[in-house]
């Protein structure tokens, strides 16, 4: 007695094609998760909400994306093998994994939207204030985190401004001030911004006062080199101004010095990452729904026959 299967010819092709797409989607999930976690220009915003004590973390979206991608690389084989062999068991398992991926994608998009609203306006300021009062001395990891993320938050512009005015470029022998100075230089270099609200934040800052005292030049610098428009080959750790003299002029235009404050850039940066997660999450979820429907239709079309052959 032999077992034969037929049915669902076109659906087999459709599910096979979807399985290949599923692998590509898996690679996309892995890339997105690694990009958000490892890119030094992006991962600090994920750490921004890592201190939340009672709520889920935005960082969970990146990990969910990474885990889903790794799982999908394996699950894609189930769909392809199930379609080729007309195996109801493999296809059913594939559908169950698709449902799980669908729920994870929806969770990723929803969680991102949740944090977009949660940390807009003054909500982040409330979080920082609560963290400072209640946890600054209690949890050992909060102290260095708070010391370095005060200026990450676009909704507390005055805190950013205070850091620029009081800690940037002064007493860099102290680890905290050195770290703050390096970060602000990187932020201004990569995001093409200057200060918190604008270049004028550096006027009358402690950095400006210290350069006035230490400089042997006729005119001491008014703005950091990282605020200037850079030439080709410059880096965040070795900024090279297109025209340092013109950059230092009070009325310098955008051709020579960045005019936008970094708080505004951070707001755009944060929203960009949120919408990447939202678009990828919900877009992938819709595609998973298509795969679920195709696989279920193929399962219903498969016919199994038990053939008895008489051998003479």
From Swiss-Prot:
Say which family it is in: Belongs to the tetraspanin (TM4SF) family.
Quote a single Gene Ontology cellular component term. axon
**UniProt membrane topology term:** Multi-pass membrane protein
Transmembrane spans: 17-37, 64-84, 89-109, 274-294
InterPro entries, A to Z: Tetraspanin/Peripherin, Tetraspanin_animals, Tetraspanin_CS, Tetraspanin_EC2_sf
Q: What is this protein called?
A: Tetraspanin-17
Task: Provide this UniProt record's keywords sorted from A to Z.
Answer: Cell membrane, Cell projection, Membrane, Transmembrane, Transmembrane helix
What Pfam families does this protein's entry cite?
Tetraspanin
Question: What tissues express this gene product?
Answer: Expressed in dopaminergic neurons, head muscles, vulva and spermatheca.
Q: What gene makes this protein?
A: tsp-17
Q: Which domain of life is it from?
A: Eukaryota
Matching entries from Gene3D superfamilies are given as:
Tetraspanin
Main location, first listed in the record = membrane
Where would you find this protein in the cell? Cell membrane; Cell projection, Dendrite; Cell projection, Axon
The UniProt function text for this chain reads: Protects dopaminergic neurons against oxidative stress-induced neurodegeneration. May act partly via dopamine receptor dop-2 to negatively regulate dopamine reuptake transporter dat-1 activity. Also plays a role in modulating behaviors linked to dopamine signaling. Confers protection against oxidative stress in the whole body.
